[in-house]
Amino acid sequence: MYKQSLLSASIVLALSSTSAFADDYALFDEVVVSATRTNQTLINTAASVTVISDKQIEENMAKDVNEIFEYTPGVTMNSSSRQGAQTINIRGMEGKRVKILVDGSSQPGSFDGGPYAFINSSGISIDPDMLKSVEIIKGAASSLHGSDAIGGVVAFETKDPSDFLKDGEDFGGQAKLSYSSEDNSFSEHVALANRFGDLETLVAYTRRDGEELQNFRDSNNLENYAVEDQDTSADNLLVKLQYQLNESHRIEFLAELIKDTSDSDIYHSSYDSYTGADDTEQNRFAIKHIWFADGAIADTVTSKVSYISKEENGVTKRFKPAGPGFPPYVPANNDNLQTKDYEYTEDKLEIETQLDKEINNHYLVYGATYTHSDISNTNMEYNSDTATDDKLYVYTPDAKEQKFGLFVQDEISLMNDKLIVTPGVRFDHFSTDPGKNTGESLTDFSDSAVTGRLGSTYKLTDTGTIFGQISQGFRAPSFDELYYTYDNPGHGYVNDPNPDLKSETSISYELGYRHNTQASSSEIAAYYSDYDDFIETVVTKKVGGTTHYSNVNLDSATIKGVEFSNTLLWDVLVGAPKGISTHFVASYTEGEDGNGNALNSVNPWNAVLGLNYDAPNQNWGTSLKLNYTANKSGSDINFDDESGGNAGQAELPSATVVDLTAYYKPMKDLTIRGGVFNLTNEEYYRWNDIRGDDELYKENSQAERNYGISAKYEF
């Protein structure tokens, strides 16, 4: 059966990949895991999946999560200038609609404080140098991954000891130094791997230090809450122990410790000083047991227990001298230093068991998952002026979330493996139990759902394959969507809770074609998703000068679009000099609610062209990338704030950004890389960064022309 003959040689399907060499041009497929929970070749996967390898991350000189997806149309980041990466957007679906996995473990959730950045909490903590690959499922994957995967999955996989132990060696590793003028950042990375008989170990550490983004801001004309100066640091420690007990049993241990800090000077016209100190600590521990059972009900049983503890603390200090005016609670005759101490904590326990069984032309995958999360979210306000009371703000109650899932999938190979049909079904139960620390009596929430999926691939010829799928999605509302309360009428903003929210449901359709030859690789896919009870934040009422917001269920929403990618190896195609390749990829998405209003979460269409050259001796190479983003204006924007839009929303101009990178290997194990980014020094913006703004504020622009350099030594 096809499962027993997988070829893991990678082709250059990501846009930044430089070409391989003529002897290696048999364009075999990458192996993906997240889309089917099995090791499946991409060509036999009935879904759009993008794979970004560690090689591509290196070639792009990515130094943070934002830059990992820089050249992946259809995938964008939502970020905060103060706190960095927040959530991932896939085809207009974002936040808790996109499931984030690291080594198969669900990550802590994000928290969106609306207009108040000091109470945001990120859902992503990962360092690019630790990654072996990133898999992106574009579209609903609830039947395999549960509630949070209604909009897709991003699966990060960290490196293993075997990635550094070459040719049977018992010791290996790498050391890397890098610098970027984009934010004046330095990083140091080291990884050490060992083999002691049947035990393999890995210890890897990365340190990063940087400053604020060097963009097109005008320091003399800043808007309130703009970051003026910033110092950042990040520490990431990864430890793995993998022990092959015997032929039947393997056990793996993992520990990851992450600490991110930033200190920001923030501009605000109403304060003499305004600072923010943000610290995130996240610890992840996991143990996995693999049993090669070769039994009647399973060939392999994989069991995993993971625990993640996250604590995010943001301290905001703002000083207002004595005198009348904003804010109104500052007495006229007293100075006041106000300190807001915000804390978000989440402890998540996840247990999962998966059984794999091959029976004739069937490959069965079935199992169960259980997740328990304890979440806390509070803010304490202290005032140096004794006439102003200290206050405790509880934006959401302490909450306990529980998720339980059962899943089964069958990959059926027919017609001598030309046709593969993959039905799957999953049952999910979700519950949220709010605590009593808000002083209010809040109702519990629980819901259950059965979701299904039917996918298929059919090999038309030796080089052409069509694929398609119909998949259902389900997402229960998160604790903050149910209970988030922010009452600040003095600033004209109130967010009301809505514990009566319903779960979102969806049905998605996708149809595509893949074509692989010795000289080219192409894919085109069209997709359509229909959502019911779509959860959106809208204006519910206006009372005097106060606007009330709340999360509500919209009757429906639709998202549709098309994506295309093509890689050409020009030496094989037309006899050009060896090592020349191009890669083109484009993504177009549009979305609207049931009333025909545009979904502002949908990004404008985007296309990237990469021109690559690798010298035949593999000692040097270069890549030129053109990244085009279309404008977003007019009917593509929802200006109605009562249906989830933004009144007065600024329009986004189109932009073309040019990046140039190169590498040189003066010796076998030493690689020096350099790059010039935004080569033409174009002032440009990302749609996600200006959503909600009434004009293009320069402090929200992307980096001006900048350069980066790195040196990596492998041993």
Cite the ranges covered by each PLM segment.
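Signature of Gram-negative outer-membrane beta-barrel scaffolds
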Residues: N224, Y363-G464, D487
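Acidic, small-polar-rich N-terminal luminal/periplasmic segments of exported/outer-membrane proteins
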Residues: D24-F164, N184, L511
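Periplasmic-side early beta-strands and strand-to-turn transitions of outer-membrane beta-barrels
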Residues: P161-D163, E169-K176, S180-T280, N631
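Gram-negative outer-membrane beta-barrel transporters
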Residues: S413-V421, F430, S521, A526-Y531, ...
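Outer-membrane beta-barrel signature, preferentially recognizing the C-terminal barrel domain
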Residues: S270-A296, Y344, Y395, A399-K403, ...
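Surface-exposed extracellular loop regions of Gram-negative outer-membrane beta-barrel proteins
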Residues: S110-F111, K259-D263, H268, S309-E311, ...
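Flexible loop and strand-edge segments within Gram-negative outer membrane beta-barrel domains
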Residues: E228-Q230, S248-A298, S309-T345, D385-T386, ...
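C-terminal beta-signal and adjacent terminal beta-strands/loops
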Residues: L213-F216, F474, Y527-D533, I580, ...
